[in-house]
Amino acid sequence: MAMKPSLHFCPTTVTKKFVYSFQSSFCFRFLRYSSSISLGSCKGVTFSSRNDQIASRRFSFSRDCNNGVWLENWNRIQKRNQPKPPKVVVNYRKEGRFSGSEIVSGDDNRSRDGDGSTMEKIVEKLKKYGYMEEVQNKEIEQERRIEKGSVEDIFYVEEGKLPNTRGGFTEESLLGGENVIGSNGDVGFPWEKMSAKEKKELEAEWTAKKENRYSLAEMTLPESELRRLRNLTFRTASKMRIRGGGVTQVAVDAIKEKWKSAEIVRLKIEGASALNMRKMHEILEKKTGGLVIWRSGTSISLYRGVSYELPSGKWNKQRREETPPEAVIENHDETTTMVDKSDEKVHLPQLEQETTSVEKKDQTSPVVEYEDELDELLDDLGPRFMDWPGDNPLPVDADLLPGAIPDYEPPFRVLPYGVRSSLGPKEATALRRLARSIPPHFALGRSRQLQGLATAMVRLWEKSMLAKIAIKRGVQSTTSERMAEDLKKLTGGIMLSRNKDFLVFYRGKNFLSREVADALVEQERFVRTLQDEEEQARLRGSSALIVPSTEPANKLVSAGTLGETLDATGKWGKNLDDDDHSDEVKQEVEILRHENLVRKLERKLAFAERKLLKAERGLAKVEVCLKPAEQREDPESITDEERFMFRKLGLKMKAFLLLGRRGVFDGTVENMHLHWKYRELVKIIVKAKTFDGVKKVALALEAESGGILVSIDKVTKGYAIIVYRGQDYKRPTMLRPKNLLTKRKALARSIELQRREGLLKHISTMQAKAKQLRAEIEQMEKVTDKGDEELYNKLDMAYASSDEETDEEDDDDAFPETYAEGEDGEEGEILAGELSETEDKDLDSNESETGFGDDSVLFAEDLHTKSEDLPNKKVRLQHQS
């Protein structure tokens, strides 16, 4: 449809700004997918304005006369906006005339630059008629690519592509996505529907959605029959419960008994078996021979099968398992009418290995051979555990093996030269990973008499380096630990892992097979026999009486022979058969032991003395910080009736003060005065161990606060102290008294008190040790001439080593820390440094009051004198000998 040239359009101010903004930056183009409109030629309507400058810039629209061209070009494949490499030279020139070049129709022959030049048109025409090669075209196209990120690239519009939210044009944002553009590149209308073929192609592509799994019942039974059986399942109300023991032989017999009257059995799985329903699915199909037609949560519907009543049920089951999946699918297509006959192939998702037993036939041959060989080996080891809830092969029932074997001995082991006996971390990890995948070899329930199991494990280790033992239900963890220790002693293996379900043992690097072990034992027995014979010959030779001759020997004796040994013994050797000589040696040993014990006791006593002195110093440092207030001379008194009422009211009070480890400090007294502002009583809860300590705290509170102590009662939270403020109570100007410690210093004082309590306990311990040392010294004096073996052994056990002494000496330096003033501006300091000379004098004067100083000094002097007498006794004994 042609437009009349006499029609004019005068843009408004907004239109002017819009045109000016696009005029200097890029070439504006109106595109409709594959059709284009150039803004260069003046064929149709001319736009003009009143302004002379704008009148010179005319926009002319050219439209093809054929109205069906745009509809024919709708499905034409458009060129996608591929990533553009940077352009070598970019034309950013600004022209006064805003025109666009015409786009030549074709697949790849399009002009991308808004400024159409004559040379470019000539090149495009030459390429169209075949006068130019493809290489030249690629070189020109490479030169004319727009730089990525430039102004032209941002506002560049290509046919068939829509901008994304960020202003760019990507392959993913083509006309709203792949629902408009097909896989072959055709552009479709939004209202058009996809064909069935396109849907299948899209479904065949990979998606993140989990694929459906087909069970054995879905592949073997027709859909109508499967629907009927499921409806029958929903109408069946009774359920059979499978407990934590799993699918035992009793459960299998019960299921088969129910199949005689009904073709469907509903099961409810309980206990640990319900944690893995997929595995329970496989176990039920394998042990019963049925088919699981429905499963939801822990509920399973088990179908007995089409050929259940036939006598050759096992053969049919085996035949069904050996049927390949392709044949099953073909039979299913023939029986069902819902499948389209035109489709030759049915695309099913890939069946996983753990869904059906059909996949087990596709496993590699080495795994099957291992299972068969293991099954034969387990048959030789003992009877099977028929109630095993897991897969085949069934483990050996270790409870049926003999408990005690007469003359049982652990297997003989020899570690090869240069091999480390223990396992490295990587080796142990690899063996544990291997043990996870193998089935258990034994099932054990008892905890004693495991010699039969140990023998079977040794036989198993000849073929396999691991022995995996499953623990039956009901065995406690402590019992399994005892089982593991007993088996480790009986077999000599290495325990890799132990949990509530399995025990895994490694045979060890020093394990030997039965034949090799027997040969080595025989060889060792032969060597021992030869050694015994040689030793007997030496004893016979040494028992002969040899009299040393004074005449020089003319014969030379060869070195290293028995004759040389006898010669040397006769000349310089000591005869141990002499009783006097043995008594002398024993007496010397006793004297040395006596010296060592006295020296050890002396060190102990000296250390105890130092400990007592340091304990007294610590007590003195703590007492320096204590400056309690004195009791009032004329305290205000209350009557018994008032005391009874105040006690009753105070115990009913909900508000209370909690006195912690800091004890009585300025903050405690301040809180008491704050309580007395609104009430006459204050209740203080103290968590103390003894009543005497609570009484001291109560008296201190009464003295510091100026109140009247009403009562001290035992409550559930500790002890309750109730203090009455008095009739003539006046609030003091300073709520925090200056004579008490601050919160920080009170904490330091509590630490010192705790240390003092420990030191007092240590003092009492040292006092008891001192008494014990005195008694031991007195007893040692009685046995000086003749040693008492029982006494020496007792003292050696009491003072075995000097490690304890070194540890205690290291603890001597643990003095109270220094508590200095912080940044809160508190006054005073608590320092734990050295005592002054006056304090040392006070301690020396107070030493007699403690009752330890004089006794310890006298005791040390006695020990010193006794230790000096020991060398003299030793000399006398040597002269006597």
Swiss-Prot record:
Alphabetized GO MF terms: mRNA binding
Phenotypic consequence of gene deletion: Albino seeds that fail to germinate or yield very slow-growing seedlings and stunted plants. The seeds of the double mutant plants cfm3a-4 and cfm3b-2 fail to germinate.
Alphabetic keyword roster: Chloroplast, Coiled coil, Mitochondrion, mRNA processing, mRNA splicing, Plastid, Repeat, Ribonucleoprotein, RNA-binding, Transit peptide
Subcellular location, record wording: Plastid, Chloroplast; Mitochondrion
Annotated spans, Disordered: 799-856
Top-level taxonomic group: Eukaryota
Keyword DNA-binding: no
PANTHER family tied to this protein: CRM-DOMAIN CONTAINING FACTOR CFM3A, CHLOROPLASTIC_MITOCHONDRIAL (PTHR31846:SF19), CRS1 / YHBY (CRM) DOMAIN-CONTAINING PROTEIN (PTHR31846)
Quaternary assembly: Interacts with RNA. Part of large ribonucleo-protein particles that contain CAF1 and/or CAF2, and RNC1.
Name used for this protein in its record: CRM-domain containing factor CFM3A, chloroplastic/mitochondrial
Organism: Arabidopsis thaliana
Gene name as annotated: CFM3A
